[in-house]
């Protein structure tokens, strides 16, 4: 599913606020202000990261996301699969402007198999500008512009079918 899910990150249809599609249990997951890694850890034994891609990419490769970040010559891209007990629950794409990668934020390029949330939410300088909610191929997604010490990065997360988000929807519908 993961290889097939990566292209879905670029095909997400972002919903207007408010949308009648957004139930209370969906909003509880999609508007989570804390670390999604931490939220997942409450539902499994172990959360791990499978690193799918890390590289500098050009502005042409970020298409619609460019409007949400400052113009740069290149951006650091990190695409991962977040697994719970070995089962993929989420794919994520992080875009970091090159100008963000100075000072302590250089560590964003060296996370490897460390979940982004563990790094971000350990910082006292983390803020979030917004959370957008959307869908792609029937799967739910969210997008956030976060700031570390005022420097932006964009995180897009797509919840895979095994994610507990969908379990909460099933309970809501019974």
Swiss-Prot record:
Its EC number is 4.1.3.40. Gene3D superfamilies: Chorismate lyase-like. It catalyses: chorismate = 4-hydroxybenzoate + pyruvate. One of its GO terms (biological process) is pyruvate biosynthetic process. One of its GO terms (molecular function) is chorismate lyase activity. Keywords: Cytoplasm, Lyase, Pyruvate, Ubiquinone biosynthesis. NCBIfam families: PRK11655.1. This is Chorismate pyruvate-lyase. The lineage of its organism: Bacteria, Pseudomonadati, Pseudomonadota, Gammaproteobacteria, Enterobacterales. The gene is ubiC.
